[in-house]
Amino acid sequence: MTVLHRRHEQGNEWVEKYIAFCVGTMAPSAMWQALLEAFRGFGGIAENVMQREGPFGMGLFPIDPGKTVKLRVPDALLVPIDAVQLQEGAVVIKDPSAFPPGYADWFMQYQANHSWGLDGCRSIEAFEEGLKALPDAVHQDLKRLGLYNLDNRFPGENREQEIFQRFLKTRFINHKGNKVLMPVIELVNHAPAAKGFNQGGDGIAVGGVHADEILVNYSVSDPLHRLLGYGFNCQEPSGFSLNLCLQHNGQQVVVQGGGRSDGLTKPCTIERQDDKLVVVQPLLGLRREPGLPRTLFSRACAVVPGLRANELFDQIHQGNTMALMGLLLQLEGVGGDGAAQLRQGCLDHWIAIGNDLGTRSDLLQSA
């Protein structure tokens, strides 16, 4: 375990107890319970939960699977990402006075022993090194497809800070107009079939009865954007387009790839810009309702005269398929974890966009 020493505020018995555990030689389970006791002392809720290794790496599990899990980080304990910094290798709050007395010390020890210092820094560094080691031709394809730009993402000018910034991007959540960190809850792993975070009322919460690992759906995404954004493979049920350029009916079409939070329910945006047509984040496949992607795309095309919706959808679909095939060919024979993860991401993405079958006539008629 990691112990960080700094001048900490006196008078908070929960923080004093937790720091005593960190300084001592207590078992990790005892330190975890001290962490939660201090967290509850600040107004947080953490019941029936423990941290341990699972199939997705370190995660949170119920102590008693037959009982309800309760986790809540109130607004007062959410930490804006611009309120933290990396100081001598430790994640610290810049201005402790903006939070309850003792919270900055608790947060620093929490990050050192359960988040950034436990697995966060190491896993981010390993993933970024794996991507950096890919062949130049793969880097060029990833950049063209809007998935990864080495020069912007990991230029190597300040390695520690670059890893830290990637860490923040994988941990923050948009809440009431701010990008914030949610201590303890951020340790919950992602699963597409799980419920999302409860952001109603005061703070952010996760709860319910969990037979095994506590999981939550981070957001709407697809396999490749999840992999390049978060650093792990996931068989997401939806597939969005990658960046593409093509010709349709004698006109240049620019497709902006990526997922949208409302991408499973609302048509994408299609508009004319100067001499080209811009299609923004079209959904190409959806496992639970394979007739929806083409239906939503047809509704988007209906507001732009002169488009042949089915033909353009097929062109975008084919362009994505060819791009994935190209990446897989470039990765053939390439070793390393980064190449292996990217290969799996391409295959998962190919499956995801393949969930396209027919249209929803009821939705087309009601448009």
Where are these regions (language model features)?
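Short, conserved catalytic/metal-binding motifs centered on acidic residues
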Residues: 1, 67, 211
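Catalytic core of the SET domain in histone-lysine N-methyltransferases
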Residues: 13-53, 111-221, 265
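Short, hydrophobic/amphipathic alpha-helical patches that form generic packing surfaces
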Residues: 105, 109, 163-171, 325-329, ...
